[in-house]
Amino acid sequence: MDVIRPIEPAASNRHRFILVAIDYFTKWVEAASYKSVTKKVVADFVRNNLICRFGVLEPIITDNGANLNNHLMKEICEQFKIINRKSTAYRPQMNGAVEAANKNIKKILRKMIDKHRGWHKMFPYALLGYRTTVRTSTGVTPYLLVYGTEAVIPVEVEIPSLRIIQEAELSNAEWVSKRIDQVALIVEKRMVAVCHGQLYRQRMTRAFHKRVRARNFEVGQLVLKRIFPHQDEYKGKFVPNWQGPYMVCKVLSGGALVLSQMDGIVWPKPINSDAVKRYYV
């Protein structure tokens, strides 16, 4: 779950933010636009748009934003026994599925709107377009993996497709029988998507390892931490963008590090190893 923020200019209804959640397997996206993403807005979105529609979630992965991690979210997670996992700080790739969905939603909206302040009117159609488009990682549409059949999109109403023409000739009993067959095959379709996704991840992993060299750190080493442009410590392009030194006090799987200041105070949030570099005295 993540927030697209802020959209300028704001929509005519003054909405400037889009709260987005994606299912990692089906790639189904739930999203809604708001004037501001407050703690209550996030809690209501999780309860109304996710839990009440799709059932209790097992984990929810968010970034470290204060509006996505608050006492209201904690209460909902405790009430429904949901695990709330946080991605590594300053590392959008750790929540890559929703970041990719954000990019695609913005790209679809950009192509659909004529007046920038009217994007909220086209937003539901952008979601429909995303849900009915084949995703590279699964080989099928999110709509198919959720409902077991493809959606009837608006263009098929104007220009009937072969599927629509064939279904129009079916009797009610034949249509029901066909729908039952589609639902019966949904498990098989999902297993095919699982296999496709595994092969896709293997290809992406091989491509990543070919061009990226692993950086190994050990406990006790001194490092410098990168200052990112959105941080308060950032002073401009011509000022050093590293701060420290810090000490590595724990090495986590996946390349994340837990750092501590030189006075022994441990940072509460891990940071990815590509945001630090060795410090030599």
Which residues are covered by each model-predicted region?
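Integrase module of LTR retroelements
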Residues: M1-K189, A193-V281
